[in-house]
Regions:
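N-terminal beta1-alpha1 ligand-phosphate binding loop
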Residues: 2-36, 41-48
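Flexible, gly/pro- and Lys/Arg-enriched active-site loops
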Residues: 35, 49-58, 68-74, 79-161
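Short, structured patches in soluble enzyme cores that scaffold and shape functional sites
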Residues: 12-14, 66, 132
């Protein structure tokens, strides 16, 4: 681990275009970013959209170590989204790419632009299941990840090969 680096988790999702390929490309773009090292991808999963219509999502989570400050990392995530044609038409709209900063080490961040830990991550199987692939012992404010997974077991999620 590099001194001054932080372990970061980012959720990735897409349900328009070649969704899985988009996620793989976005992960490679993140891995190639100065200040980001040791990027690991969870499995890919298929899930139905939350509170909207449209095609099923492909979701995963990435873990990496990072020396970028959180706001600079957020800028990079949003730039990658835009490179892939992300438009923010309305909440939960179908999207070519969605990158959400879930955890930035142990930091608690609450600014106009950024809330970390992500405020709804503990309610979403499409975040918790791939997150558990990478961090099966993770403890969140709402409880151990294994306990949180029990609360979302009614949400349909399918691992892709």
């Amino acid at each position: 681990v590099i001194p001054g680096s932080t372990t970061v988790f980012v959720a990735m999702g897409a349900n328009l275009g070649e969704a899985r390929q988009t996620l793989e490309t976005a992960a490679a773009e993140l891995a190639a970013t100065a200040g980001i090292q040791d990027l690991t991808l969870a499995h890919f999963y298929s899930t139905a959209p939350v509170d909207s219509s449209g095609p099923d999502y492909v979701n995963t989570v990435v873990r990496f170590t990072c020396t970028l400050p959180p706001e600079i990392l957020l800028d990079r995530l949003q730039a990658i989204e835009q490179e892939h044609g992300r438009t923010r038409l309305y909440r939960n709209a179908p999207r070519t790419l969605d990158l959400d900063l879930l955890l930035y080490g142990q930091e608690q961040i609450n600014t106009e632009r950024l809330i970390v830990p992500h405020p709804r991550m503990h309610e979403r199987a499409f975040v918790l299941v791939p997150l558990a692939d990478l961090a099966p012992e993770l403890e969140l404010a709402q409880g151990h990840i294994s306990e949180l997974l029990v609360n979302v077991q009614d949400q349909e999620i399918k691992q892709l090969s």
